Design a protein with these regions (language model features):
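Long, hydrophobic alpha-helical segments
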Residues: 52-68
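A structural motif at transmembrane helix-loop-helix junctions in multipass membrane proteins
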Residues: 129, 134-168, 218-222
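Transmembrane helix boundary and interhelical loop/hinge segments in multi-pass membrane proteins
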Residues: 65-85
């Protein structure tokens, strides 16, 4: 089972590296959104630090949404999705592997460029650490929850708008607790409670969403 997950993840990474725009477009979008705020409201360190939580996570939500649509769509169009359903491993395992690969290509780069965010938004070390921790816990949850919307709309020709309407309301709890943790860190307060809730959301998403995604994919294919 682990070898099957590794095989699917490796396949997804190889395909993505052949189409590097799929990797860099969400990343550039994230950087551009972050950069626009200091340019628009002025380079006032105290103001930027105060609104940094909202800036980072709104940009992260939008960049995640930008990359979601292709999660299953290409496989659906070329017939690979049906072949995956015939693999001698449960479909939820294949789904987990694809979502993990999606996070490695979209969520992990956001974490790696977080030091740049600290410079652009005038974050101190504790606030930056909270940003990193919320991104590490929260971005995989975005991928798992977003994959449900992709699976439901994979058979539609122009499902981008519907995907946004389905997914964005489900992202709101993650946005609330992630920004709350960053705000608490900027004030020198503890934010273990917010991280615990985000961790519970991630565990719930890993446990439950693969089955919902698999059911939605079977409906879409049939």
């Amino acid at each position: 089972m682990i070898s099957a997950i590794g095989m699917v993840v490796r396949r997804e990474l190889l395909i993505a590296f052949r189409r590097q725009a799929d990797i860099f477009n969400p990343l550039w979008f994230f950087i551009i959104v972050i950069t626009l705020f200091p340019l628009s409201i002025g380079p006032e360190p105290s103001l930027l630090a105060r609104i940094a939580a909202g800036i980072v996570w709104v940009a992260a939500l939008l960049s995640a949404l930008l990359s979601l649509e292709r999660l299953f769509r290409d496989d659906f169009q070329d017939g690979s999705l049906e072949q995956m359903m015939l693999l001698p491993v449960p479909l939820p395992i294949v789904v987990i592997a694809k979502v993990v690969a999606h996070w490695l290509l979209t969520g992990l780069p956001l974490i790696l460029i977080s030091p740049l965010l600290a410079v652009l938004l005038s974050l101190d070390f504790n606030t930056w650490l909270a940003v990193v921790m919320t991104l590490v816990i929260g971005t995989p949850t975005l991928s798992f929850i977003g994959a449900i919307g992709v699976a439901l709309t994979v058979g539609l020709q122009k499902g981008g708008v519907l995907l946004s309407l389905l997914v964005l309301p489900l992202y709101i709890p993650i946005l609330i607790f992630a920004t709350s943790a960053i705000d608490a860190a900027s004030l020198g307060m503890t934010y273990n409670g917010q991280l615990a809730i985000l961790g519970a959301m991630l565990m719930g998403a890993i446990t439950l969403t693969p089955f919902a995604i698999s059911a939605a994919l079977r409906v879409s294919v049939n």
